[in-house]
Amino acid sequence: MQIKILLSLSFFILISHTLSENISLSSKILTAEESFKIFVKEDKNNLIISMKINERSYIYSDHLSLKDSNQDVLYDIIGNKIFITDEFYGESPIYKNSLELRIPDSYKYIGKVLYLSYQGCLENIICYPG
């Protein structure tokens, strides 16, 4: 089965006021690929997109979507959702460490391109919006 997953990421920097002047910012910044590792597999009739999230990073629950060319793709999320107080979004649900998107009836997407979009941050340093 062949399903293409395209990731949508943009990039901007938020420099924290709490960083010490003695710490090099460049040594602390991770790329989006280092912060969020994505794996795709099939399990029975489910397509599973696993995201391993760096220990200093997180993904906003409300800024996560999966679409094909025509519509939103329905999925279940498996992961530990917690809430943080964010200076830009206020009280925000996020995922840390890992999460899985389980897409039922994966046969529906054979030959289609799925677009995964998400927004996440490296704590107090940089955000990677989708």
Regions found by a protein language model. Name each.
Residues 10-18:
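Hydrophobic h-region of N-terminal signal peptides that target proteins for export
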Residues 2-5, 17-130:
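Extracellular/lumen-exposed scaffold segments
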